[in-house]
């Protein structure tokens, strides 16, 4: 019998997958990664349960083959404000054989904490990064544009 919390987490992941796909991300499992999958243009890949040296990130986001972000997924009802330290830890973790959109030791730029109901986002390139509620996941093209522009002016 599957414990109720596992069912909640599985349902949450299914809904997050659907929201990521609606935003243009290709969802992949860590055992079958193709960081350049999809049509020509910007390749936005979300890899489930990606290993880091501090544990598996629920999702690691890649733009054109380089890691650019983390999504920490929690079941409905979780306090996302208390999860930001976990996503921040994954964002600075060492990634074997993976290129990054940040220097080693610097955090990946884009971090999300999400349930099936709400999504928090922060840009670690901001001088004083803070999580804020957003209505949906950003599109890969948006992140690519931001990465090409460099750090925000705030």
Predicted regions and their residues:
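ATP-dependent helicase/translocase motor core
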Residues: 1-154
